[in-house]
From Swiss-Prot:
Domain of life: Eukaryota
UniProt-listed Enzyme Commission number(s): 2.5.1.18
GO biological process, one term: glutathione metabolic process
Listed name of the protein: Glutathione S-transferase A4
Record keywords, A-Z: Acetylation, Cytoplasm, Transferase
Modified residues (N-acetylmethionine): 1
Gene Ontology molecular function: glutathione transferase activity
One Pfam family, short name: GST_C_3
GO cellular component assignments: cytoplasm
Amino acid sequence: MATKPKLHYPNGRGRMESVRWVLAAAGVEFDEEFLETKEQLQKLQDGNHLLFQQVPMVEIDGMKLVQTRSILHYIADKHHLFGKDLKERTLIDMYVEGTLDLLELLIMHPFLKPDDQQKEVANMAQKAIIRYFPVFEKVLRGHGQRFLVGNQLSLADIILLQTILALEEKIPNILSAFPHLQEYTVKISNIPTIKKFLEPGSKKKPPPDDIYVRTVYNIFMP
């Protein structure tokens, strides 16, 4: 039996959550080793397990992969979530890169000063509604298909759904002006592997709380 991938990261969303999403969508079971102390990170660094001294790190297929996008590409390619040809791969990559720019605002939000957090929610909403969501609404309206690229599930769909659902936690009506994205979100959420990941008891992490923020500061701050 093949060894399960092992994810090394604190017990929270951060940059590892996209990796969890893609593995889950692919139907791949995985283990996690949560970082809780600076000493655990130091041990990984001293053991030459982290190419650039940073996490996320995923042990998979005899490798220790780092750099979030590289990890996502490897898993997506392995599990046929990265298009059928170069053109599709490039489209998927463009969509993913754009969505990850938006997702990064969500990842960093809990580490802002309290006075700045509400302002940043407004900023995220504005960017989503003006810059990002119109792109995907136009794509879905234009080709009339269920998925963004190639009429099959891809990394682009997974990362977009992750980002939409995370935004809806803060701004429930964020999709009110985007009917195609509303329908798309429901359809992708009901793909069996994704539906299972969205159910209680899965390895999907909850929104970051004060405990997660303190843990991250304790591990990574000098």
